[in-house]
Amino acid sequence: MPSRSNGLAAEMEAVRTLALVGPAAAGKSSLAEALLHKAGAIGACGSIERGSTVSDHDPLERRMLHSLNASVMHLKHAGTRIHLIDTPGGPDFLGQSLPALEAVETAAVVINAATGIEPMAVRMMEYAASRHLARMIIVNKIDSQGVSLQGLLADIQAAFGRECLPLNLPDGVNRQVVDCFFNRFGRSDFGPVEAAHRALVEQVVEVDAAFVDRYLEEGDVDPAELHAPLEQALREGHLIPVCFVSSRSGAGVAELLDVIVKLLPDPTEGNPPEFLLGEGAEARPMEVRPDSSLHVLAHVFKVTVDPYVGKMGIFRVHQGTLTRDSQLYIGDGRKPFKVGHLFMLQGKDHVEVSHAVPGDIVAVAKVDEIYFDAVLHDAAEDSHVHLAPLAFPVPVHGLAVEPKRHGDEQRAWEILGKLAAEDPCLRIEHVAATNETVLYGLGELHLRIVLERLREVYRFEVLARPPRIAYRETVTATAEGHHRHKKQTGGAGQFGEVFLRIEPLPRGAGFQFADEVRGGAIPGQFIPAVEKGVREVLAGGAIAGYPVVDVRVVVYDGKHHSVDSKDIAFATAGRKAFMAAIREARPVVLEPIVQIGIDVPEHSVGDVTSDLSARRGVVTGTSDVGAGTVSVGGHVPMAELANYQSRLNAMTSGQGRYTIALSHYEAVPPGVQQTLTGQYRGHEEE
């Protein structure tokens, strides 16, 4: 009788993990549905239009007819357990699709035969390569009218390399596909399959010198003997298989299941993920082995937060065996939790299981401490273990929000925190300069969905608007100001007189206050009141309502009254003297200038640089970063970047990406200043 450890090892080798990635409308969800149905996991294929697919179970997904979340499913075929992750295809939802790559051996990039290679397909191929995953391309919707599949295959090879070779070819006459790896003979829409068979075998044997010699001697090698070199070719990116399917008609779906089971890597054959031990510069690579007998290491690649069910962590087991009785630590946490209930997911349904081995994708519920990207482990010494970080796009599209009902600020923060826990590309920040709570996401659609979730899931209403620009005010010349405050109301009066001087300071120097009063013209106890009045203007602005910065204020003379002088009188005099001085010191409004980096296709560089110039930006340089991509660097006013991602998408067919970081402040053009000061005067008059 085999030992338990041998049984678990065999179970682990009978696992495949696959993420369906690529552009929206490529048919990823429909393909997942077809695979589930063909494997007998569901009785009939659901429909996206009817909102009945397993993967798109969120009410918002059903309403929008698009995937918005990564959805985990499982099925069995030929004795092998297949974990399948369907991912959204929109660039606004990379926070959902990219983490799925951390949980699988193979990234399957799905391409719509009718629309060809789209930017998201290119992007996901790049991300998968950067994580050293086996990659395959699935051409879906092959029964679309007027499509040249031969031309599309040529486009795929031109875009991704000659290592993209078909494992099967379409046979339109019989509405099926023909295997060309195990099968040497037969015909397809591309002609005889023998040429495709030879190309595959030659590509595989190239990674093993012994097989190369044998192939040259015998003219062919039985594909059944090529499993080890095939897996090596997949690991090294030397082979990127291409499969043709139609999720609508079912053509190629059964063959795709066979490919997944027979040819794609199991957890022992794929490239192991890059785990690190330690933090920062001290971090060093750590060996993790897909061995069910070792201590547990698992990685949380998705978190969901339900207002009724609580927090659920979905994770991939990389090492060791989990059971319901396992005690797991979360990251650097000191207190373990008991698993209790372990689930496999089938869309929104949870199927309880007794254990999980390397390769399994499972979930635990009602664990409040769990968080995205956490490493779960059962050995205290494995604290400070983490996965090498993913290069997420930086969320730069902002939206200021505030509760519709006054007094709900704390609840707003709590709910927004729950949404951010589910989405690594959603950032929440309180911007002190404008006193706003700002949501930062990957685009307009991303943030619109966040607001929809607030309303529909949490029944919480917010007011949303573009974030205010953090303008500043300063002066460019030295000037003097004077004000006498005198108020007599019949009883005790108020009196204070202040003479002061203001001087510009270098950018970033802040505020300086000096007392040069001599002879007791203003008694020392009233100087802080003068400064208080000045600081009121600093905070509220003098010409446009924005904070005043980089000025030096010197109080040098004044008058007081032995009875009527009070703090309030000198605060008022100081404030109004400061305002008078600013008006004479050539005041200007400063605007934030950001450093921008834009990655775009070569053919879009001219459009992007021209557009940047039209936004009052300055291009500082361009550099070739490879793969037909150019990085454009420059500086541009923050105010000119409203809805920039939408414009960039239009100029680059969705392939453009940008990041920004605050660089410096500089004076706005006269026309802009006139508009800002005019708006402020109008506001003050209301």
Feature annotation, model-predicted:
Residues 1-686:
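Structural and coupling elements of P-loop NTPases
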